[in-house]
Amino acid sequence: MADLDDIKDGKDFHTDKPQTNTLFALKGCGALDWGMQSRLARIFNPKTRKTVMLAFDHGYFQGPTTGLERIDINIAPLFEYADVLMCTRGILRSVVPPAINKPVVLRASGANSILTELSNEAVAVAMDDAVRLNSCAAAAQVYIGSEHEHQSIKNIIQLIDAGLRVGMPIMAVTGVGKDMARDQRYFSLATRIAAEMGAQIIKTYYVDKGFERIAAGCPVPIVIAGGKKLPEREALEMCYQAIDQGASGVDMGRNIFQSEDPVAMIKAVHAVVHHNETAERAYELFLSEKG
């Protein structure tokens, strides 16, 4: 505590310079409060306004799928190369070292499995636990046009309201029903609905035709899902096209941890997202880094 000795009056107030307050200039976040902007500034690189998320939350409904049998062996070596980790609270507490000091997007929906209807989800994490885990965002599926569309939207609304109370961003993940077409019209609808409900980030799929319309019509940042495993060159091309057409990053899982060389692949993805490398140049980087 400062004492009362030798107190000097302030003199240099720079009265000729107005005070500035630099906000985090991310799409759609200008009206958010300080705590939420601070969390978003950890997720999205403040210089590039982009992010490379490493998704390994698949086990919440798929179980120990290929590449995720042992998180501590297969995934932990990738942590240092990712901007953000996306996982469940069970894996976070049991496997992820706190000292890794990476922002976490916490999977907050669940209660389903690959043996049942995927759209039948519930909120699976209380907001106070997300805060306790020092998460930078919470994520939940929204299934537009599916059997349980109404409940999935209610889940998102519940999380958004809880997040606003504590400054926690919510990422809405556009799940696709079994009979839904993966096209621009559908994803424009799904992403816009989630944003209108108040989600601060949207995770959706890249489509070859019309993705720029999806990104332009969504008032908050979009990150693309990696989806099924693709050949490395194709996955990097998808990344490049998505960023070029307005995405604010990627949230990839299988296309990284099921790669021939996961470390080389995440480095190549990073080059596309943050350094605007073409898919061809990034693939050359992948080959040069490949062990």
UniProtKB/Swiss-Prot annotation:
Q: Which SUPFAM superfamilies match?
A: Aldolase
> What EC number(s) is this enzyme filed under?
2.3.1.245
Catalyzed reactions per annotation: dihydroxyacetone phosphate + acetyl-CoA = 3-hydroxy-2,4-dioxopentyl phosphate + CoA
Primary place of residence?
A: cytoplasm
| Cysteines paired by S-S bonds | none
Which locations, inside or outside the cell, does it occupy? Cytoplasm
Q: Which GO terms describe its cellular component?
A: cytoplasm
Functionally, this protein is described as follows:
Involved in the degradation of phospho-AI-2, thereby terminating induction of the lsr operon and closing the AI-2 signaling cycle. Catalyzes the transfer of an acetyl moiety from 3-hydroxy-5-phosphonooxypentane-2,4-dione to CoA to form glycerone phosphate and acetyl-CoA.
Q: How does it assemble?
A: Homodecamer.
Q: Which family does it belong to?
A: Belongs to the DeoC/FbaB aldolase family.
What is the name listed in the Swiss-Prot or TrEMBL entry for this protein? 3-hydroxy-5-phosphonooxypentane-2,4-dione thiolase
Organism (species): Salmonella paratyphi A (strain ATCC 9150 / SARB42)
- Gene field: lsrF
